[in-house]
């Protein structure tokens, strides 16, 4: 037996009409319809509702919709289901509804009438109330023509027999009737409450026009394919204003009819409506006592059980909203509806609604089915709930408080909506998690509270309700986290690239630029990232924004890009905003709040909403906010930190009353110290606290006062009786190495920053850096180590940050307060600059540079040489490689020996050190202290220090060294794009600027070197010049055919001594040719490669570039390579400067103060420019042409083209140039032969040369990389060489093989 529906009492809300008024409305409508059925005959042709072709004739047209009265065609709705609303969300959301017609919750009246009969046994009418359907499409029926004689009074319904069903074979209406009736409109009636049998108005105000109209059968068939045959749909709406579009998507309520006996008469609609609304259901065959047979029009009495909660229906575009009340249970379908489609049983009986006004019932997506969905409210046989229960949405605390006070609640007249309360249209929509066809993950929302809620400061970080975070469950063994919370992908631990990356990850102490979950141990990467964020000499914002994936990391990144699930876009959720940061699900699973710091810093770095300064402000704020979690000992979270900072323990009072026996108290304290002096054991680790500078320590940690009393108690004679005495336990075992500046000033030999007085070349350090101080005793213990040369130890006392780093690397000891350093190798590499020049007073020039990550003047580490990919090339930022290349007068490209990525050992700068040049990096130990110490030391000797700053202004370290204007300071940042091939990689080679470099006084190069050399000549006139831009200043250690660690350039004598003996007596000519480079290009990647080139200049000897002045502003030469004048491009294309370790740089001179780009004509340029240098080969050295090969395989052939070979007597008669004029490959009288040939060739002129029909020029042959390296292109065959041991060669044989009494040059056969 079905249980009666559950009764719920709901208070009257704004916008809901009174129940009595709704009953009166329905009774009056039924009485009016039945009254007209008796008066008017059924043969009236203008009956729109109950006539022969009326709306309610057939079972397909037994759906009456009040919006169709106005003749408006409702548009289809895309409907949506949302969260269940609370009682306070009942106010309608349309502004037009505030002054329009009231909403008639007709279904609530059904439920009220039905609930009154809950105590009795349910009857057929009760069981017929099966469901309430929302979103049913309106079906427009054909309208009969209107009688002209009844224009002013509307239509009259016939007797109830008009509701008898019509056979499907006889459809109602036809196309012609539809067209004829579509133009007809009925004139509505304007009535007031209780004085007319028409549709009454609930409120005493003007109502909008309503009319009755039919629907088209096609629309009905398309929109009601799933609806049952016997049912009544009622709807309340309003007619739009003049000029506005009709309202759409109103509520439609389908009320199933009571069961009838097969073959019996079908009751009319009014009778069926009466059966639903009446208190009792008539027996089978009995005549119903209809209310319109009496004249009683008084409102019916009913109990005060209230109306069930109403749920607003969603409507798109701010359309009127109706309200629906649901019956308590559902019943079996009507047995007579045999041809009606069977609906699927719903998964849940609970009714849900949507609170958004931007969509309607049904699917919220436009591409979903437009067919409305039916929501069941009960089970078919039992009243138990099926499916998942949905918790009601939380309501606002203010609204719930106002609902509690019934006496103070505002009494709103029914039919009107409140406009004094908050606008309910401004409300977010939460979609149902279990909605059919929409699988969404369970979400959570924070409670609405005005009181701030602070999460627990200890333990794992959980959700606000204490539950674990979504997706924190253990993963399967073959899956890793990827994408949104809870999603995973398949792991690839067995891939070779992943294995190699994991080996590098385990061996590295720095954060890897690309982290994938297969690497494992995310805590290691998080610790390294936190170390990077708090590192003072690193820029975490720049590194997180662009970690510069190169080599194996780039290949690994491309490998994982191919493994992305299909359909994912680039903006898909991946769980990490930057490649170095692990998936945030690892932090969520462990509940580690500190691991959110790298994610926050990476999000700031990747954001485009902030500039550089704003990003660093946010980064500094994050550092301060997470400092207590990252470094609890340094920020005072541990007792040891409170002791070292001088803060008393919160549990132990800092002051006590005077003890009458201080000696006894002192003895007690010596045996048992107080609680606030207890210390936690220090962790033995090399963590970020070790690498942070003093500045970070001071900013985050207020250190304790350095003046610690030696006595255990204060002397009784020095204190007042009224003051308590502070009892201390004497000095602690491990005091902080760096403290704040004493109030009485620092000691002369203490450790602090010596900022010179007066004007400075560099920015002034901050107050925190200047207040740092280290006692002389601590300095003596820290610097007493063989790692630090004695002459340079005072420089450490100028930098308290360096002292703090040394102290952090030394674990605490027993008798000795500072034990041996833990990172000996790291400290040795960072203080290697102290061994460049033994005596600080021998320093003449200080060159400051900012190395790229991975660049080190000590060379790569031996342990990581095989696995470390090396530094990343940057075309805009110059590091150590660009600085050394400029000092050695050569190009620096990723394929040359000058690039640090090709080094196998440390570069040799001893030639510069011998002339007093000191190279100092911004990452070196005591960088700031060294600059300030040298400035103070030389100033005290009445000497001026020369400083050449190659660091860009934006890369200058925070709180860097302060340099007085007494010294000479030149700022010239190192710029790789000063090389034309780097500035214009696509067109520089074709324009002939492959070896051109632009020189400027504000760029690290020959122009800025000239300023330093001029100042040096004025300050030290008796000393040898600096000679900064020379080929012999720097030597590199690279891998060549002579060995994996070859010092280049290798002199010709060393080449013959170490390379040739390996092929002495070799009969395999192919092996000999490959080993000696016979027939290969003379120069590969700007360095000597072939046998004849190595035997003449040395293996790895570099070609010299041509420098073009471009003024003070970098980039003034023009935005394109074609902007360089033609004559300058011709000169650079044909100029080939042979290697010379002592040659000066070739800088094209300006004319009358103008740069090379401003020559007026070719004659002016020809007169100002030097002769075009060339490489000339003596007879017997093979072909006269010189071949250059680039890293991409492109070959340049320099020599005569288009004619026969030069006569032998011409070659023999040409004298070889000496070292003084090697840059002039031609004599002055040869200018007309050489330069004119090149000039005419560029302009399409003559081709006069040394040989008939030939001209000197350059031919470019493009081949694949690595192809034809052992075969000459268009030249004579390779030379057969008979090798002899040259260990006893004389010094005169270093330059030439023949012509000076030595061995004769190798001759070619055939």
Curated annotation (Swiss-Prot):
- List, in alphabetical order, the GO biological process terms annotated in this UniProt record: DNA-templated viral transcription; positive regulation of DNA-templated transcription
State the source organism's domain of life: Viruses
Tell me which UniProt keywords the record has, alphabetically. Answer: Activator, DNA-binding, Early protein, Host cytoplasm, Host nucleus, Phosphoprotein, Transcription, Transcription regulation, Virion, Virion tegument
Q: Where is this motif: Nuclear localization signal?
A: 677-685
Segments carrying the region annotation (Disordered) are 117-271, 285-454, 636-696, 1195-1258, 1282-1310
Composition-biased stretches (Low complexity): 351-364, 392-407, 648-666
Please name every pair of cysteines joined by a disulfide bond in this record: none
InterPro entries listed in its UniProt record: Herpes_ICP4_C (IPR005205), Herpes_ICP4_N (IPR005206)
GO molecular function: any one?
DNA binding
Q: Where is the composition biased (Basic and acidic residues)?
A: 341-350, 1217-1227
Q: Which residues carry this modification: Phosphoserine?
A: 686, 722
Q: What processing steps or modifications follow its translation?
A: Phosphorylated by ORF66 protein kinase on Ser-686 and Ser-722. Also phosphorylated by ORF47 protein kinase and by human CSNK2A1/CKII.
Name the major location: host cell
Q: Name one GO cellular component term.
A: host cell cytoplasm
- Localisation per UniProt entry: Host nucleus; Host cytoplasm; Virion tegument
Q: Where is the composition biased (Acidic residues)?
A: 1228-1250
Task of the protein: Transcriptional transactivator. May interact with and recruit specific components of the general transcription machinery to viral promoters and stabilize their formation for transcription initiation. Negatively regulates its own transcription. This immediate early (EI) protein may be necessary in virion for viral pathogenesis.
What assembly does the database describe for this protein? Interacts with IE4 and IE63. Interacts with human USF1 and SP1.
Under which name does UniProt file this protein? Major viral transcription factor ICP4 homolog
